[in-house]
């Protein structure tokens, strides 16, 4: 591979690094919202935790967990792409 293509791969990898940093920040935000919702659920009286309000809160927590998992998958995928690009440069 010539140096121009290697440089282009380096630029692409820098963009991927930026995406990974963004994903990390988003993961932190999702995790914080999830933790706040969990705290709110935990602080409800037991009778409310088992009622409709508690179910809605638990559904929200579960959805946030799924969102967090999706972001982790995206981050992992981007790291795999970087590995492949690094291999291509060799």
Q: Each predicted region: which residue ranges?
A:
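Long, low-complexity or tandemly repetitive, helically biased scaffold regions used
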Residues: 2-90
């Amino acid at each position: 591979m010539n140096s121009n293509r290697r440089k282009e791969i380096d630029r692409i990898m820098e963009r991927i690094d930026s995406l990974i940093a963004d994903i990390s920040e988003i993961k932190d935000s999702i995790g914080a919202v999830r933790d706040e919702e969990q705290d709110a659920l935990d602080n409800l009286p037991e009778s409310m935790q088992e009622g409709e309000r508690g179910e809605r809160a638990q559904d929200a927590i579960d959805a946030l967990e799924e969102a967090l998992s999706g972001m982790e998958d995206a981050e992992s995928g981007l790291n795999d792409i970087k590995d492949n690009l690094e291999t291509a440069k060799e």
